[in-house]
Design a protein with these regions (language model features):
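Active-site alpha-helical elements of protease catalytic centers
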Residues: 49-73
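Short catalytic helix/loop segments, enriched in acidic residues and glycine
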Residues: 15-43
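Ribokinase/PfkB-type carbohydrate-kinase core domain
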Residues: 1-25, 47-50, 68, 77-79, ...
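A general structural signal for well-ordered alpha-helical segments in protein cores
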Residues: 55-59, 84, 166
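Short amphipathic alpha-helical segments at helix-loop
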Residues: 39-43, 71-72, 154
């Protein structure tokens, strides 16, 4: 479980970093002043879209290492939009099963990845990723995934999003002698 973010990555010029008060080798949460940044990146630079977020990145690497399609599952919240569709398709192409909760009122979370001279600046807009609900995890098909899994991984960021979900998985893993990693 974690915060799924669609990375929007581009090699940029210094002017866009200055315009949005961004520093290289830094990671921040987006503020209102950053809202136009993502569209500006798309309009001004060739961009690459990558399924991201700390936990989802780790799950994708694990899936790649295991080399068995569907060996991993990622749970989180996305918006009902093109970015959510792109992220779902990217994960499926990587062999990761996704069980996203769909938030119809909030856009999919994004992370601007601005690269200059081999260094980067990250600007995360959590959006729907911040809206995951415990009730989604409790749905029979999702809880079955928890029951069937042997290992669980989540970044600590998710504790602020759905502590009940984190505690339920921790309790299940402890009661069933399974490995829960954070």
């Amino acid at each position: 479980m974690g915060n799924p973010l669609l990375d929007i990555s581009a090699v940029v010029e210094q002017d866009i970093l200055d315009k949005y008060d961004l520093q290289l080798n830094n990671a921040i949460l987006a503020e209102e002043k950053h809202n136009p940044l993502y569209k500006e990146m798309v309009d001004k630079y060739p961009v690459e879209y990558i399924a991201g977020g700390a936990t989802q990145n780790s799950i994708r690497v694990c899936q790649w290492m295991l080399k068995t399609k569907g060996a991993t599952t990622f749970i989180g919240c996305i918006g009902e939009d093109d970015f959510g569709t792109q992220m779902t398709n990217a994960c499926q192409a990587d062999g990761v099963t996704t069980k996203y909760m769909i938030d119809k009122s909030t856009p999919t979370g994004t992370c601007g990845v601005l690269v200059k001279d081999g260094e980067r600046s990250l600007i995360a807009a959590l959006n729907a990723a911040n809206n995951y609900k415990f009730e989604h995890l409790q749905e029979a098909e999702n809880w079955k995934i928890v029951e069937d899994a042997k290992f669980y991984y989540s970044a600590g960021f998710f504790l602020t999003v759905s502590p009940d979900s984190m505690m339920a998985v921790a309790k299940h893993s402890a009661e069933n002698n399974k490995c829960n990693m954070m």
